[in-house]
Amino acid sequence: MSYSIVRVSKVKSGTNTTGIQKHVQRENNNYENEDIDHSKTYLNYDLVNANKQNFNNLIDEKIEQNYTGKRKIRTDAIKHIDGLITSDNDFFDNQTPEDTKQFFEYAKEFLEQEYGKDNLLYATVHMDEKTPHMHYGVVPITDDGRLSAKEVVGNKKALTAFQDRFNEHVKQRGYGLERGQSRQVTNAKHEQISQYKQKTEYHKQEYERESQKTDHIKQKNDKLMQEYQKSLNTLKKPINVPYEQETEKVGGLFSKEIQEAGNVVISQKDFNEFQKQIKAAQDISEDYEYIKSGRALDDKDKEIREKDDLLNKAVERIENADDNFNQLYENAKPLKENIEIALKLLKILLKELERVLGRNTFAERVNKLTEDEPKLNGLAGNLDKKMNPELYSEQEQQQEQQKNQKRDRGMHL
């Protein structure tokens, strides 16, 4: 049994939008996601745009065209909604590439009905990962022309209804897909959520470390600017130094003729001031040559690119961790169903065996077989409790008295 899967999330900044753009359009040089098969990337396609887009520019264009609200849009307003539509591998394994494209065309049709065709930014299908899926983006503009991600996305109840409508939409197109159950209904294991949170926390810490490096560079730059300004102030200080011409006697030991020696005599204090201004001039001259040559701009540009790459990789790791967790969660649903079927069959077999052997013989035999395996003994007891609840309700008080005893942890005779 396969499921229809649709998820949606708010994108809170232009930087995050750029990270999504690079992931969706495969613009990065390297990817942390090992599921990407680069030899198949050419099979990816977008059902909205013929060419690659700058998502932030496209969002601004959509808002300019479709926003009719009277209020000025806040700088921290959410302008981008990102989502994903897919199913499981069992579904796509039975689809040709043309069938798969038709499925996503129907999915795009649903998005246009929900959000409005003019508000759809992209609908990009990735065929180069383990499971085909479609990333979609929307500008959250309401029917009356306001920008409101809160109203367009809604709360958990609204999201549940959104998922219901999508499942009904694909069913009407002939796909026998069940609705993907929410985590609250399926009671996903706490361990899985903890692992996901650990991965997310790791990338968050990595991003914070890179931010600290950036702050350190900024502090260093501020310090250099202060030193530069100090040198500039020294250089601008007017020079007004009293001085004397050095003289010497000429014409022999007893001669009175005096002439200038060609040197100027100044005080030690004034000499030190000269030295400061000379050093300031040298420092500024070196900085000027560094800037004039273009090396300063090149170095700063390189530094910004490196930091931008690190930030994009951190964003991509978080997105991939989120995608991998959701895919793992959805793939586990069929396994859960199979386990439930197996348990149901086991109950039927045990009930029949109990009928053939009789209650006492059956219970003694099971307890004997599992007495050295506490977990198996406990499992057998739980199954028997579900099969014969009336026996346990009658002996509830007795169970409470014996619950800490080592023996009699299995079935009741």
UniProtKB/Swiss-Prot annotation:
CDD domains: MobM_relaxase (cd17242). It comes from Staphylococcus aureus. Keywords: DNA-binding, Plasmid. DNA binds at Y45, Y115. The keyword DNA-binding applies. Transmembrane segments: none annotated. This is Plasmid recombination enzyme type 3. Residues 175-198, 374-413 are annotated as: Disordered. Residues 188-198, 403-413 have a biased composition (Basic and acidic residues). Contains conserved positively charged amino acids probably involved in the binding of the pre protein to the RSA site.
